[in-house]
Amino acid sequence: MSMSPKHTTPFSVSDILSPLEESYKKVGMEGGGLGAPLAAYRQGQAAPPAAAMQQHAVGHHGAVTAAYHMTAAGVPQLSHSAVGGYCNGNLGNMSELPPYQDTMRNSASGPGWYGANPDPRFPAISRFMGPASGMNMSGMGGLGSLGDVSKNMAPLPSAPRRKRRVLFSQAQVYELERRFKQQKYLSAPEREHLASMIHLTPTQVKIWFQNHRYKMKRQAKDKAAQQQLQQDSGGGGGGGGGAGCPQQQQAQQQSPRRVAVPVLVKDGKPCQAGAPAPGAASLQGHAQQQAQQQAQAAQAAAAAISVGSGGAGLGAHPGHQPGSAGQSPDLAHHAASPAALQGQVSSLSHLNSSGSDYGAMSCSTLLYGRTW
């Protein structure tokens, strides 16, 4: 969108602004107040209505430009040499700058701008801001001497340095450790005596004993923790039986004592034929008792038969008793092994039957002899 009007006019914007620019230049050179620019501005406002229409057509751009020129009218022009020295960092030339003058406040139209009755809050601010007199920039020349003043100032006292650590000799450490093994806590006289012996102060001995006691406690605690960790890891590696290890040991202690027993019979055959086992001796004695009882019963039966047959039978039957009694050692020999018990019983029954048959036979022969 073009800012120029669509229809042509007999004058231009430059014709309207040229009187203002000339007045601004005069004010800048003379350093005067705002009276002349305002008069020139009023003359510009007194233009024909066509000029007002042209200014309205220009819009806010023209208003901002006019306001900028009006504000800049009250600012005095600075010399390029003074500003150049300030920009280059040369503070020595600050005294050459002209003093600042508040022409807006000092002009005749100042009360119209600021008002005759200012806000009651402003005095509190002006008290901190100071008077509105011109600010003298010549005092800035003293800034160059700040470096010299800072050099002449004494340095601030720093924090006290930490005392250097004292290293004990090997002989001192050996004596301290030897005394620590004997006695972990020392009284004041003992501390002084030990310190005088190893050329230390009682405070150093006291601190060394404190540190050494703490060191021993920490080592003992670390060692116990390491042993506990090893036990836990060992129990976990054994299939999670770490918690049951004490219970297993207690059960083994409460269980009866185990005794090694040799094998006597295997598959019906004695393992040791030459030396009878301790259990076999009792079995052998029991078998002998049974054999003796059976022999006595056989003898009683034979005696009854002999008494019934006659006196001859009494002489003949005792001759056979040793034979029957003599068979008991054989029975005892057969009873040496538990496997022969069944055969022993059968042999005893056979012995009884054979004895009775033999008695009957003897009686018959005796009868036959009598008949002869």
Swiss-Prot record:
Primary localization class, coarse: nucleus
UniProt keyword Nucleus present: yes
Biased amino acid composition, Low complexity: 245-254, 273-288
GO CC term (a single one): nucleus
Residue ranges for the DNA-binding region feature of this UniProt entry: 161-220
Xref: CDD domains: homeodomain (cd00086)
Domain of life from the UniProt record: Eukaryota
SMART domains (alphabetical): HOX (SM00389)
Family per similarity comment: Belongs to the NK-2 homeobox family.
Subunit structure: Interacts with WWTR1.
Name of the featured protein: Homeobox protein Nkx-2.1
